[in-house]
């Protein structure tokens, strides 16, 4: 999860987020090189004692500053397109869950193998335990098995919401009357926090999302426990 005064990205907890971090570093390298080149050119021009006042055109330089930016755009665009299609790639998911946004809480359904449904509300400050995150803890967490291909169906019951978990590289709008989907695979055990990322009313800030990634055996035990409570 994010920490105070954090400047970098969260640690990746999914293959997609790892690729996003690599792409971020790739683009930042390109931007730094461009910035250094521009500042160097400015410094040379400012410090130069020679001025050619009668230069009206230059076919070579115009070709250079057209071709080089085009090449740079291709260098940035190709990894971006690859990542874009990777985020939408969903091949034979092993588990499907449905997330429904409400004002102002989330409800979840596990309908593939287990008939499990529950609502997930933010815990008030008075119910927090020592070490819990303020405004991020919920009464019912989404429990998922690690290293498992999961399909998340996202929709809303009232207004537009957005189901977002940064450390997993997930963000999908929840639109009433429309069913969106995204691919999810947790690459390590842990607890990952997110929030609604679409302004949806007075209590928009109080719609946290908590995903708990556990080993498959623990997930099966959790499912049995939830079924016993039904």
Curated annotation (Swiss-Prot):
Q: How is the cofactor bound, as the UniProt entry phrases it?
A: Binds a dinuclear copper A center per subunit.
Pull the Mitochondrial intermembrane topological domain ranges from the record: 1-26, 83-230
This protein's UniProt keywords: Copper, Electron transport, Magnesium, Membrane, Metal-binding, Mitochondrion, Mitochondrion inner membrane, Respiratory chain, Translocase, Transmembrane, Transmembrane helix, Transport
Q: What is its EC number?
A: 7.1.1.9
> Quick one: which residues bind Cu cation A2?
196, 198, 200, 204
Main location class: mitochondrion
Query: Sorted alphabetically, which InterPro entries does this protein's record hold?
Result: CcO_II (IPR045187), CcO_II-like_C (IPR002429), CcO_II_C (IPR034210), Copper_CuA (IPR001505), Cupredoxin (IPR008972), Cyt_c_oxidase_su2 (IPR014222), Cyt_c_oxidase_su2_TM_dom (IPR011759), Cyt_c_oxidase_su2_TM_sf (IPR036257)
Catalytically driven reaction(s): 4 Fe(II)-[cytochrome c] + O2 + 8 H(+)(in) = 4 Fe(III)-[cytochrome c] + 2 H2O + 4 H(+)(out)
Q: Where found?
A: Mitochondrion inner membrane
- An annotated GO cellular component: mitochondrial inner membrane
Q: Which residues cross the membrane?
A: 27-48, 63-82
Q: Name one Pfam family in it.
A: COX2
Mitochondrial matrix side of membrane: 49-62
| Residue runs in coiled coils | none
Q: SUPFAM superfamilies, from UniProt?
A: Cupredoxins, Cytochrome c oxidase subunit II-like, transmembrane region
Q: Which cofactor does it need?
A: Cu cation
Positions that bind Mg(2+) = 198
Which biological process terms from the Gene Ontology are attached to this UniProt entry?
ATP synthesis coupled electron transport
Any one GO MF annotation of this record: cytochrome-c oxidase activity
Enzyme class, top EC level, equals translocase
Q: Which family does it belong to?
A: Belongs to the cytochrome c oxidase subunit 2 family.
The free-text function statement in the UniProt record for this protein reads: Component of the cytochrome c oxidase, the last enzyme in the mitochondrial electron transport chain which drives oxidative phosphorylation. The respiratory chain contains 3 multisubunit complexes succinate dehydrogenase (complex II, CII), ubiquinol-cytochrome c oxidoreductase (cytochrome b-c1 complex, complex III, CIII) and cytochrome c oxidase (complex IV, CIV), that cooperate to transfer electrons derived from NADH and succinate to molecular oxygen, creating an electrochemical gradient over the inner membrane that drives transmembrane transport and the ATP synthase.
Record-linked NCBIfam families: CoxB
- Name the chain's protein: Cytochrome c oxidase subunit 2
* Organism this protein belongs to: Branchiostoma floridae (Florida lancelet)
């Amino acid at each position: 999860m994010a920490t105070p005064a954090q400047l970098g990205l969260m640690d990746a907890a999914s293959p997609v987020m790892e690729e996003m971090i690599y792409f971020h570093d790739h683009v930042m390298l390109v931007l730094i090189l461009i910035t250094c080149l521009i500042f160097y050119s400015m410094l040379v021009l400012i410090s130069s004692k020679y001025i050619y006042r009668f230069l009206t055109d230059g076919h070579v330089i115009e070709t250079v500053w057209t071709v080089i930016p085009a090449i740079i755009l291709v260098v940035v665009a190709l990894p971006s397109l690859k990542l874009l299609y990777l985020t939408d790639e969903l091949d034979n998911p092993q588990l499907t869950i449905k997330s429904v946004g409400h004002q102002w809480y989330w409800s979840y359904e596990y309908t593939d193998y287990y008939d499990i449904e529950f609502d997930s509300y933010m815990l008030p400050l008075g119910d927090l335990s020592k070490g819990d995150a303020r405004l991020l803890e919920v009464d019912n967490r989404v429990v998922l098995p690690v290293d498992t291909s999961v399909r998340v169906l996202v929709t809303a019951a009232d207004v537009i919401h957005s189901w977002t978990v940064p450390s997993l590289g997930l963000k999908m709008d929840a639109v009433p009357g429309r069913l969106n989907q995204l691919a999810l695979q947790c690459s390590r055990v842990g607890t990952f926090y997110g929030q609604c990322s679409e302004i949806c009313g007075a209590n928009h800030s109080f719609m946290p999302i908590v995903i708990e990634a556990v080993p498959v055996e623990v997930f099966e035990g959790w499912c049995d426990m939830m079924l016993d409570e039904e």
